[in-house]
Amino acid sequence: MYISKSMSIKSIVEKYPETIPVFTNIGFKGLDNPAVLQKLEEQNITLEKAMMIKKEDVDAFIPMLQQAIASVEREDEGVKEASLMGLLPCPVRIPLLEGFEKYLAENKDIKVKYELKAAYSGLGWIKDEVIDKNDIDKLADMFISAGFDLFFDKDLMGKFKEQGIFKDMTGIEKYNSDFDNENIHLKDPHGDYSMIGVVPAIFIVNKTVLNGREVPRSWADLLKPEFAKSVSLPIADFDLFNSILIHIYKLYGFEGVKNLGRSLLSNLHPAQMVEAKEPAVTIMPYFFSKMIPAKGPKEVIWPAEGAIISPIFMLTKASKAKELDKIIKFMSGKSVGDTLANQGLFPSVHPDVKNPVNGRPMLWVGWDFIYSNDMGELIKKCEETFKEGAAE
């Protein structure tokens, strides 16, 4: 707030009506009446003139006005409502929602409007309402979702990242050792995006339809000619699929992406993949490996190069740090991390969570790669190359 001696009484009172009692205390009556204010305006009564009339020290009076204004601003800050939207992986949506509601019940001072949807609801509305209209206010103060292309494309959410709208406020200085070691550094070095976990992609091999082929144990194996038209891919899961394309490109170039297209037999939802009998190999989120019987024709393979991951992002607006503080602490905390890791097999970045990966490697394309490439254009090129391979 800014108060100067030259401001008119009318402008002060109209902008800061909470100052009326302060004026009343020194004998100014009727300032809640527009007609009185207009008359003072016509007489060009400034704050300095008013204090001369009342024989008050203007320099001592201004802090009293500022205190009245500040007290109301503090009250306003205390009741501001934060907004949270999450698109959560289906297996953990309900337990996370229940945990959050319990947390809110224990912390009555948190004021938040929230909606935690299943991930299949999709992100199309963000492109329509937030990105195309360039209206970041349409996005919740906190937004949780996977979204590999959405968050890194400079024409999509990437443009808001460059403006410094988001800030990692989790306070986690070092990610879980599964994501911070000699092979992987997942934490955003620019401090814009925070993450709560990842969705790893693994293989399920149906040995009954290998027809003499060896069990593929690496991404490189899937690109071999013998696995042409033999693999189911989660194309409908755009986040994971785009992440797979980018990682294959980084490892094996556009030829590798085309070979992955050649390997495509069918495009199924992960839940359908478990029942599919034709593909020799299905690529799916690690969670669905729970459904594979220990004894049977199907074998769960953790790729030798590592499970390709699609991060679960948590975007928080820097301007809403105060309103989001306790919500950030919960969503980035160990309780949520344990739920992700144990109920969803989605490894958590929280340093104290024991992830269900048992030291097995995970593949992350890397921040240097992301910052040195136009990710939106690269994903489009990879998609085109994949389709070329699939059409052969």
Locations of the language-model features?
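Early extracytoplasmic/lumenal segment of secretory-pathway proteins
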Residues: 73-155
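Extracellular/periplasmic juxtamembrane helices and adjacent flexible linkers that interface
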Residues: 76-79, 322, 329-392
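A structural signal for short loop-to-beta-strand junctions that line the ligand-binding cleft
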Residues: 132-134, 140-144, 168-202
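Ligand-binding pocket segment of bilobal, Venus flytrap-like solute-binding proteins
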Residues: 152, 234-306
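Short beta-strand->loop
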Residues: 163-174, 294-308, 318-319
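A bilobed periplasmic-binding-protein/Venus flytrap-type ligand-binding module shared by bacterial periplasmic
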Residues: 202-209, 309-322, 339-340
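Short helix-loop capping/hinge motifs at secondary-structure junctions, enriched
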Residues: 208-216, 250-255, 319-324
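Short loop->beta-strand "edge-of-pocket" segments that line small-molecule binding or catalytic clefts
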Residues: 220-240
